[in-house]
UniProtKB/Swiss-Prot annotation:
Responsible for synthesis of pseudouridine from uracil-55 in the psi GC loop of transfer RNAs. InterPro entries: PsdUridine_synth_cat_dom_sf, PsdUridine_synth_N, PUA-like_sf, PUA_sf, tRNA_psdUridine_synth_TruB, tRNA_sdUridine_synth_fam1_C, TruB_C. Its EC number is 5.4.99.25. It comes from the Bacteria. This is tRNA pseudouridine synthase B.
Amino acid sequence: MARRGKGRSINGIILLDKPTDISSNHALQRVKRIFFANKAGHTGALDPLATGMLPVCLGEATKFSQFLLDSDKRYIVTATLGVRTTTSDSQGDVVSERPVEVTQTQLDQALDTFRGDIMQVPSMFSALKHKGQPLYKYAREGITIEREARPITVYEINQLRFEGNEVELDIHVSKGTYIRTIVDDLGELLGCGAHVSVLRRTQVADYPYDKMVTIEQLEALIEQAKESDVSPYDLLDPLLLDMDTAVKKYPEVNISDEMGEYVLHGQPVQVFGAPDNTVLRITVGEAHTFIGVGKMNEAGLIAPTRLANL
């Protein structure tokens, strides 16, 4: 999702460490104001309860946010056993309370059922839409909508800690996976119920964990700029990652400046040896300046599908 408005034409991606108890959109708007960006969008919402990596795209980078939305994610989650809630997290109402009599062997066996390609029924408390309305709005009105199970992949699900009624897990999943649903399903498999009490996203695509910054750190840079009598953007803008990092996993096709002019006008070009059946990251000239993405068409030409307006 993107928001247009007055502001700077600044392009790039900031890896925000989202705090708990605010919505992803609220966090997005704060970052947009801090950078005074004319356009901003995030790359997949985190629940208000959750913290961690929320890539915020500014300016032309918003055109490529979908690629991050479609990327793999990694989370560390604490599941509290014995209590099931309406939302499958600690912010919901308690549905049931049951004794926890789970052994390590039982937990290992239950976790193993989630590994690999599985089908998952999305939570009613999700942003998936039914007739134009997100499911969570129906859920808050006590209305249950039938949802189809969707294929997901759990690449890894590793136990970090099992103490008392708490299980801490490190989970690496494909796009569209609901961690709260995994935890709820785990609780039912164990026969005691469970809900998410702590959730932190530690990775989106291949972005490094140590590049994340908090809202407080961004605001501190503004104060530092005031004290140093420099523009805050002199301190903020270096934190931005290049917009093409959103599509870094795709093969690069480097073309001449002349061919780049054709592509920027929406025209396909011929590039010998370019791979087909994949998204292509198009760069121009010796500097390998990123201008957008494309695909090979039926005529064997590289056709642009999304271009940056630089």
